[in-house]
Amino acid sequence: MPTISQLIRHGRQKQKKRTKSPALKSSPQRRGVCTRVMTFTPKKPNSALRKVARVRLTTGIEVTAYIPGEGHNLQEHNVVLIRGGRVKDLPGVRYHIIRGTLDTLGVDKRRNGRSKYGAKRPKA
């Protein structure tokens, strides 16, 4: 516990808030190039093959990003847009790829929650 005179001399230091998505550098999204597309297996109670991609961002940082939705067209050297948002059962995956922008196609035959998967409105 500091004394009053110590507080007058130095003051209190503001605690810096750590960001959950540092690679975005406080931008809403970032563009990047896929360096590798692969599958990960999730943590203990779950079982699946989750689709992920290593992405080299315009900032020069390389991150692992999740590819949401069923099926995708991503390959190496594709240009993608990523946003923040972790995947709870994949350790180290803190970013999502935005579907329906740049080289990423939207999910076809998607009826509900279309805006999250870049799907066009189906013709009646």
Swiss-Prot record:
GO terms for cellular component: ribosome; small ribosomal subunit. This is Small ribosomal subunit protein uS12. It holds the Pfam family Ribosom_S12_S23. Keywords: Methylation, Ribonucleoprotein, Ribosomal protein, RNA-binding, rRNA-binding, tRNA-binding. The keyword tRNA-binding applies. Belongs to the universal ribosomal protein uS12 family. InterPro entries: NA-bd_OB-fold, Ribosomal_uS12, Ribosomal_uS12_bac. The modification 3-methylthioaspartic acid is found at D89. One of its GO terms (biological process) is translation. It comes from Leptospira interrogans serogroup Icterohaemorrhagiae serovar Lai (strain 56601). With S4 and S5 plays an important role in translational accuracy. Interacts with and stabilizes bases of the 16S rRNA that are involved in tRNA selection in the A site and with the mRNA backbone. Located at the interface of the 30S and 50S subunits, it traverses the body of the 30S subunit contacting proteins on the other side and probably holding the rRNA structure together. The combined cluster of proteins S8, S12 and S17 appears to hold together the shoulder and platform of the 30S subunit. Part of the 30S ribosomal subunit. Contacts proteins S8 and S17. May interact with IF1 in the 30S initiation complex. GO terms for molecular function: rRNA binding; structural constituent of ribosome; tRNA binding. Residues 9-20 have a biased composition (Basic residues). Residues 1-32 are annotated as: Disordered.
